Amino acid sequence: MIKKLIHQATTLFVASVIATAALAAETVTVGGKFFTEQYILSEMTTQLLQAHSIPVKQITGMGSSLVRKAQENGEIDLYWEYTGTALIVYNKVTEQLSPKQTYNRVKELDGKKGLVWLKPSNANNTFALAVRKQDVAGNGLHTLSDLADAYRNKKEIKMAGTAEFIGRSDGIKNLQKAYDFRVPRSQLKSMEAGLTYTALKDGLVDVALVYATDGRIAAFDFELLKDDKQFFPSYAVVPVIRKETLEQYPELEVILNQLSVKLDDATMQRLNARVDIDKKSVRTVAAEFLTANNLL
């Protein structure tokens, strides 16, 4: 009798473990990188999936290469990626492509790896160089060609950039080649991404690296220098999902595409500012946006 009870208990335990594993396998893991825009996109995605009764968990605050590797390994099912990052960093494509060509190329290359790129948004979080609007009249800087002219004429212009920007192929090194100028080492300041904005706002530098959808651009009264030679790649933000996950939950394509078409530069700047400037919680900002756009 005791043996029979032990056998039954063991059977129930094993069945419980199998059921738990099956449930975990059905959970969609939403990933995200370590900056405000990604926290917002991950939270909106999580809330959307929850609203459609899809089991979901969220892992955010990851480095770019780490979240990509996690998705390729099946640890992350879904996150929002940038076309330029996938093209240059992950797929090592260095040729200059149009925004449409960039999207099509990464969709094709990543498709071979079991990753599906859904509908691209109109939010392009590309690199940009910014100046203070109050200085534009005096320094005459409106375009990157104007900036290049200023450096060629030996004007002292302090620039703030990140270590990543200074080292990447789509960063300062090749920007200087494209526009035929050179920033003297003494005038190029390397700092963390968030600090470039405050350095420019406080007048510690004259031009700074920013990201085109950052909420601080409008809040700090910056003007973006026009990339008149179209050097910077397109960084359209797009939901990317593992093929296996999409096959399990095909409704995700419609759900995520409905969100993607609502996003553009101005919208992301506003949402980012709500968190970074107005100090609203990511959860609140995400919920308000989804509700206002009839997505919840």
Predicted regions and their residues:
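A bilobed periplasmic-binding-protein/Venus flytrap-type ligand-binding module shared by bacterial periplasmic
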Residues: 127-137, 236-249
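Ligand-binding pocket segment of bilobal, Venus flytrap-like solute-binding proteins
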Residues: 154-227
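An extracytoplasmic/periplasmic, membrane-proximal ligand-sensing/linker region
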Residues: 37, 166-181, 250-296
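Beta->alpha turn/N-cap motifs
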Residues: 60-64, 74-87, 102, 193, ...
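A conserved helix-loop-strand patch within extracytoplasmic ligand-binding domains
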Residues: 101-158, 261-265
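Extracytoplasmic "Venus flytrap"
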Residues: 27-43, 60-64, 164-167
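Short, polar/charged alpha-helical segment
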Residues: 36-55, 71, 173-177
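Ligand-binding "clamshell"
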Residues: 90-118, 204, 216-230
